[in-house]
Amino acid sequence: MSKSVVAVLRTSPATVLADYHRLMNLAGYQDVVAKDAETALKVNISWHFFYPGSSTTPWQLDGVIRALKRDGYDPSRIHACHNRTVVIDAHLGERENKQLNVVENHGLANVHLYEGDEQWINVRDAVGDLADRFLCLNQVYPQGFMIPRRFVGENIIHLPTIKTHVFTTTTGAMKNAFGGLLNERRHWTHPVIHETLVDLLLIQKRIHRGVFAVMDGTFAGDGPGPRCMVPHVKNVLLASADQVAIDAVAAKLMGFDPLRDLKFVRLAHDLNLGCGDPREIEIVGDLDAARENWHFVGPFQKMTFASRMQHKIYWGPLKRPVEWSLKTFLAPWAYAASVVYHDSFWYPLHQKRVHEILHSDWGRLFHHWQEQQLPPGDLATPGWADPGADPAELRPEGLRLFCRSLGILGTCMREAPEISARRRRRTA
């Protein structure tokens, strides 16, 4: 059996587009991503505001698209793909993180899975008796659950960033499938999140023509992610067709032992869904970069108030008195609390920690992205030798953020699955 391959490269704004093309080919993506199938670029939006390390970067999305076009993939068969969560506004997020700029520049389709005429089918209709092998999803959803019909037969390229997570220690390729494959009741799986990620990988392997991941570590996030992190500039890119292996290598870079510290990696490794042992993974590209240890402290040393409460609800003393409410029409209280805490309180009060990052070359490239974008037909320019003079900015206006978060709060309450289900029953 051949070894799993993970490509690792150092990068800079001056070479990032060429680096993404080289990275993907080092990882053998053309052997995995079929040219005669639709290809979904699964964008990661962990926060609808720009925060370094939290979401798919514009140069990551742009680099992958240009690599695909350079290698002969038909742009009309490539689309960006977004899910919706009850606390994140995907439309705001794709604008604030400048992903929409990239998609529109290339003229690609932009699919929001929960909108328009998108069809969903029962998971058993898609995977058959494979569902009998699920570790936990049959218990979480005894009546089954729905997945997007369009995913069946499509390629998918995941676009995560390197960061920590308060539920899973790290998050990356495997976790990026969470929003796309599960509906808005995905929070029901949080108590068994590691087993859930393994079940979702089983589903992906059955329904997709090809599964590939391209991970951006230009910014990397430490601390109680995926939002409230301490970002660092790391200038590293990863790619692999093995979703377990790329998460293992990213975890090792951050300073974790993937088989010891990441239950979802260990479970997937033991089930032969991928390789989670770094000693058995073939690294191609920049071997020195792959040997780095960033000594991240992880998500649990300095948890936010919100993340501490989440742990108490899902795994601690509040599980019995509170968790049941998250599966009823009372659940929107948790969505409201999350939006108010993260958007109105944490974000405006913790911006000094990213000051240096915003002044980095990547921060300046982000700030100047609109005027720096290359023509969609330019597949030769390697990157941006001059990323621009001015640093990126976070939104500092407390009152405006508060007002915007109220708008997001209103949307999440209207679209909460518990409320929308009751509304559908009344109008049926």
Residue ranges and their predicted role:
Residues M1-A428:
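N-terminal and secondary-structure boundary signal
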